[in-house]
Amino acid sequence: MDKRDLYDSFGEMEQQMQQMLDKMAKLRADMTTVLEKNAELVIENEHLREHMVEIENELPKKAASTTTLSKSRQNLEKLYDEGFHVCNQFYGKRRDDDESCVFCLEVIYGERERA
């Protein structure tokens, strides 16, 4: 191997090493991006789990509050189920074909402020 071939071999090796360094730098940048995205997703996942737990804890409270009607509202519900209006507008009138009445439902299930 003469000096020129040796010099050319070193030049080729230098180019290959530079290409390897460039690939390594790109891989490092890509890996950093993936790790950052993964960390963001882990945090978002934790927040979503916490939010789910909060919602699940609220559901039984809402269900319990809607199922506990006072005695008078239970009586109104019974009349309504038998086909009569219990709202102020049509109180005591029969509901045609058992259609729903928004006013009656508000009287029975609506939330009222207590003074």
Curated annotation (Swiss-Prot):
Q: Which domain of life is it from?
A: Bacteria
Q: Which cofactor does it need?
A: Zn(2+)
Q: Does the keyword Zinc apply?
A: yes
Protein's cellular compartments: Cytoplasm, Nucleoid
Task: Give the family, as the similarity comment puts it.
Answer: Belongs to the YabA family.
UniProt function note:
Involved in control of chromosome replication initiation. Inhibits the cooperative binding of DnaA to the oriC region, thus negatively regulating initiation of chromosome replication. Inhibits the ability of DnaA-ATP to form a helix on DNA; does not disassemble preformed DnaA-DNA helices. Decreases the residence time of DnaA on the chromosome at its binding sites (oriC, replication forks and promoter-binding sites). Tethers DnaA to the replication machinery via the DNA polymerase beta sliding clamp subunit (dnaN).
Protein name (Swiss-Prot/TrEMBL): Replication initiation control protein YabA
Q: Can you name the source organism? A: Lactiplantibacillus plantarum (strain ATCC BAA-793 / NCIMB 8826 / WCFS1) (Lactobacillus plantarum)
In the UniProt record, what gene is named as encoding this protein? yabA
